[in-house]
């Protein structure tokens, strides 16, 4: 049965919450369960989801971003335990989900919330104040999804090591206490692909073993319907089975949930990343990254009406060759007996006739980490951009020096280096927040994130190009008004430096944090939307943030390379092909004429050419 085959899954499970672990999403900014708390650590690791990450990670919530449908969004992250290096078996699963603000019930509406407390059934409809409809408590998965999970029998064919786990799907090796993390289903979180219905839609699977790609793609709910046991009303207190036969015997109805019908996800080979480092890929020294082509209104109807609330999730799954999780050597609950190192804490093993102790916890043979974005919107394209190819350019990072910001990162543009074709478009947009720790290093009002963009000659320059140096041939932004908007972020009510000094009694420290000091962007909002700009000239353009680029301390620069539609070698190849075509056509014409005019001068000329004589 196809249902049973879907239970043969990878082990991507379990880690204690005390482990520093981890995957952190940097673009778009990953929350790691933060909201707008100002402490160094997040307030609540159970606010929306079970990340299993360090409490210090994550970016606080700024104003929500919105991107155009079918535009390209750079998804960047760092993962601590490596991938693609042969030292772990790993995959990274990128997923999203959206709800329609105009149609979703309170129990389904995706939102960030304004507090850090975990939602409960009594909190779903609460707003922050009587004056606003903004929800007080954050929520990603719906209450209905959570109810289905807590009322569903867990898959008892799974390896659980030496743990005694309850009967329901809200308990796994990795989370065995029944705590709720928002309305996330812990079993669905820990396993992929999952056998029960899920609201998450697959974007991509990035794996060290591409032999599994066909299976991943075919089992995705993007293309594969899922089933669950809809219980009779008299059976609500009994966990509903995941087996159709037992479901029927319980008086339930084996119920189909259609696929998302959006096409199978992409499955690609993981790039090499170092174990024990939140570092970069080997090939180009940048963070691991996936260019996500955002869904269109045919996939998410709320895009057409401008009423989408969406969230992005990236999960990082690692396991070991010591414990197989798929294929003929699939390890299931039968390995939970007393024998074997995979079921013993810190086992002693014999090496050269003597015991040595391994530093092993069997619960850590398979581990899942996770991060999620704050809520964002996907919007319809205007008529002028219907056929345009649009690349999104963001800012990642948070206030602080390299030590203070870690495991988040210092400010940087994303992508740092962008290659596009002439006449393609860039959507410049980024956000930050005002709730970083007050003592973190940075310019301007304490705790605040701000970034601007000014053109520089090369990446080795730290002074912006002057108006005299910019012209129609070399300017990233052709007109002065656009350059000013990207440099000053549209600030109003600004004071000159002399006015600021007078206002603050010549106290330079007070001038730096004065709200009317627009030179350090103090009067700008947390979000900047520079709009969509057409790149109509080829060339290379370099830029920096004047507020955050602090030479020898931190670097916030970027490069845009606008390439011709065809590379030089392609143009040469086409030219050569055209020349060859002309020569062949001319030769064929001469041969044809000579064949039908045997007494002509053309016939005599062609007959003297080796290889052509026999043709006439």
From Swiss-Prot:
Disruption phenotype: Displays down-regulation of regA, cAMP-dependent phosphodiesterase, and overexpression of protein tyrosine kinase during early development and its shutdown during late development. GO terms for cellular component: membrane. Residues 585-616 are cytoplasmic. The keyword DNA repair does not apply. Keywords: Glycoprotein, Membrane, Signal, Transmembrane, Transmembrane helix. Residues 29-55 have a biased composition (Polar residues). Residues 27-55 are annotated as: Disordered. It is found in: Membrane. Residues 1-21 form the signal peptide. It comes from the Eukaryota. Its main location: membrane. The keyword Magnesium does not apply. It is a single-pass type I membrane protein. May participate in O-glycosylation. This is Protein DD3-3. The gene is DD3-3.
């Amino acid at each position: 049965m196809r249902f049973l085959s879907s239970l043969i899954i990878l082990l991507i499970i379990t880690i204690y919450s005390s482990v520093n672990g981890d995957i952190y999403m940097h673009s778009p900014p990953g929350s790691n369960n933060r909201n707008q708390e100002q402490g160094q650590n997040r307030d609540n690791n159970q606010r929306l989801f079970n990340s299993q990450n360090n409490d210090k990670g994550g970016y606080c919530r700024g104003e929500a971003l919105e991107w155009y449908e079918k535009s390209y969004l750079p998804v960047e992250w760092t993962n601590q335990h490596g991938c693609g290096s042969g030292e772990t078996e790993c995959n990274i699963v990128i997923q999203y989900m959206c709800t329609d603000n105009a149609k979703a019930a309170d129990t389904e509406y995706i939102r960030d919330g304004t507090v850090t407390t975990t939602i409960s059934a009594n909190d779903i409809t609460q707003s922050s104040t009587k004056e606003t409809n903004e929800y007080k408590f954050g929520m990603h998965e719906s209450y209905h999804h959570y109810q289905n999970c807590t009322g569903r029998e867990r898959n008892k064919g799974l390896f659980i090591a030496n743990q005694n786990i309850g009967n329901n799907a809200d308990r796994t090796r990795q989370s065995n206490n029944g705590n709720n993390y928002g309305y996330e289903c812990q079993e669905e979180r820990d396993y992929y692909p999952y056998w029960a219905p899920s609201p998450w839609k697959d974007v991509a699977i990035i794996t060290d073993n591409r032999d599994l790609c066909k299976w991943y793609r075919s089992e995705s709910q993007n293309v594969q319907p899922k089933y669950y046991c809809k219980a009779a009303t008299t059976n609500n207190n009994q966990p509903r089975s995941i087996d159709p036969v037992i479901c029927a015997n319980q008086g339930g109805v084996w119920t189909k949930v259609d696929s998302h019908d959006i096409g199978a996800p992409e499955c690609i080979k993981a790039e090499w990343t170092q174990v024990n480092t939140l570092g970069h890929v080997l090939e180009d020294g940048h963070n691991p990254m996936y260019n996500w082509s955002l869904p269109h209104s045919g996939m998410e109807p709320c895009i057409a009406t401008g009423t989408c609330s969406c969230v992005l999730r990236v999960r990082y799954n690692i396991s070991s060759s010591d414990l197989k999780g798929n294929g003929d050597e699939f390890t299931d609950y039968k390995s939970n007996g007393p024998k074997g190192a995979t079921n013993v804490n810190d086992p002693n093993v014999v090496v050269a006739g003597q015991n040595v102790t391994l530093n092993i916890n069997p619960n850590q043979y398979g581990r899942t980490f996770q991060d999620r974005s704050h809520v964002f919107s996907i919007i319809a394209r205007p008529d002028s951009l219907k056929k345009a190819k649009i690349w999104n350019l963001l800012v990642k990072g948070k206030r602080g020096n390299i030590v203070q910001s870690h495991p988040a990162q210092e400010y940087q543009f994303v992508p740092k280096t962008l290659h596009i074709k002439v006449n393609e478009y860039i959507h410049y947009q980024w956000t930050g927040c005002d709730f970083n720790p007050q003592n973190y290093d940075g310019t301007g009002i304490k705790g605040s994130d701000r970034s601007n963009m000014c053109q520089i000659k090369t990446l080795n320059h730290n002074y912006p190009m002057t108006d005299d140096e910019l012209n129609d041939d070399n300017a990233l932004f052709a007109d002065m008004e656009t350059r000013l908007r990207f440099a000053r972020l549209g600030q109003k009510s600004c004071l000159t430096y002399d006015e600021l000094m007078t206002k603050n009694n010549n106290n330079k420290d007070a001038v730096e944090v004065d709200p009317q000091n627009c030179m350090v962007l103090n009067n700008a909002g947390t979000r900047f939307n520079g709009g969509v700009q057409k790149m109509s000239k080829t060339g290379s353009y370099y830029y920096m943030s004047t507020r955050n680029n602090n030479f020898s301390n931190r670097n916030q620069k970027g490069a845009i390379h606008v390439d011709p539609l065809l590379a030089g070698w392609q143009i040469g190849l086409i030219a050569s092909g055209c020349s060859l075509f002309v020569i062949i056509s001319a030769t064929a014409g001469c041969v044809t004429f000579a064949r039908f005019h045997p007494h002509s001068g053309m016939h005599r000329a062609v007959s003297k050419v080796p290889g052509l004589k026999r043709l006439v």
